[in-house]
A protein has these predicted regions:
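Central regulatory/effector-binding core of bacterial HTH transcription factors
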Residues: 90-152, 218
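A short LG(V/I)-centered, amphipathic sequence patch enriched
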Residues: 40-59
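Short helix-boundary/capping micro-motifs
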Residues: 11-28
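Beta-alpha-beta core module
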Residues: 153-158, 162, 223-271
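Alpha-helical linker/hinge and terminal dimerization helices associated
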Residues: 42-43, 64-86
């Protein structure tokens, strides 16, 4: 069995087709098909089943996929350690993140990391909180940004307590002029985030045992701001999500203050490959500087 066969199997499983896997690996379709067939022959059972909707893993394929991913990670770690002994810094770091981190932090993190380690490749996958946690657990990414509480089995480093704010259309007046209380949400139409994207709002509602009415849901931060701007309701948004968006909305803090705790997660910090470990340290240092006001930017109306 070869590493090439492992790479082919994982690429097909993740991309859902032989053609997409071939494109990703820069191989011909016939080379991908041959590598898969040889792998299946050595194993003695089929890994994939082709049907009209595409390709799906067999039970055997599902069972082997996590182990094959781990083998590839171990090989990458070995090559990085060998490169480090030669005085080089190389490898690949895969990061999972939700939208506001992807917009507010990651561009600066990647740029500054590239200045330090120009030979390390960084790839980004964006999704909801649960998506990112699942990618970490399945070894599809090395590091991921999620919020507390974290799923069992993840190693997390707290990064930042991100204040939660209420955004409202112009002309909106809370009971006090300076802030809004969580129970007041029940008095208004609330624009909610889509499933897996609004856990912080769900946590506030559950914490205060509040039931709200909602006529709109959206995943994209900009879409939520636009819906609120149009006068269709108010919404709860993290401060980080508002830094890079402008809109004709009012922003009110909660009293008592509400927040989400953003953490950097991995399967195990100790077992991270050198490149991923360097990125982990870089992210922690960056966010510490950012939260102290060294690199904040953006504004909102």
């Amino acid at each position: 069995m070869s590493l090439n066969a492992y790479e082919v199997f994982v690429a097909i499983a993740e991309r859902g087709s032989l053609a997409a896997a071939a494109h990703q690996l820069n191989l011909s379709a016939s080379a991908v098909s041959h590598a898969l067939a040889s792998f299946e022959q050595e194993l003695g059972f089929t890994l994939l089943v082709r049907n009209r909707s595409g390709i799906r893993l067999t039970a055997g394929g599902e069972a082997l996929l996590p182990t094959v991913r781990e083998l590839l990670q171990c090989n990458d770690k070995l090559m990085q350690q060998a490169a480090k002994l030669l005085g080089l810094e190389s490898g690949t770091v895969r990061i999972g993140a939700f939208s506001s981190v992807g917009v507010a932090w990651l561009p600066k993190i990647i740029r500054s990391f590239a200045d330090l380690y120009p030979k390390i490749e960084v790839t980004i996958e964006q999704g909801g909180y649960d998506d990112v946690a699942e990618w970490i657990i399945k070894s599809q990414v090395d590091l991921g940004f999620i919020i507390l509480p974290e799923p069992p089995g993840l190693d997390v480093t707290p990064l930042y307590a991100d204040p939660l704010l209420c955004i409202a259309p112009l002309g909106f007046a809370p009971k006090t002029k300076a802030y809004i209380t969580a129970p007041e949400l029940a008095d208004h139409n609330v624009v909610l985030q889509g499933k897996d994207y609004g856990k912080e709002t769900e946590q506030i509602l559950a914490k205060h045992k509040i039931s709200v009415r909602s006529s709109a849901r959206a995943i994209d931060d900009a879409a939520i701001i636009a819906i609120v701007e149009s006068g269709l309701g108010i919404s709860v948004m993290p401060q980080l999500a508002l830094l890079n968006y402008r809109g004709a909305v009012q922003v009110f803090p909660f009293y008592p203050a509400e927040s989400r705790v953003i953490v950097l997660a991995s399967l195990s910090q100790e077992s991270l490959a050198p490149a991923a470990k360097a990125m982990h340290q870089h992210i922690v240092k960056f966010v510490a500087g950012w939260s102290n006001g060294n690199d904040k930017g953006g504004s909102q109306s």
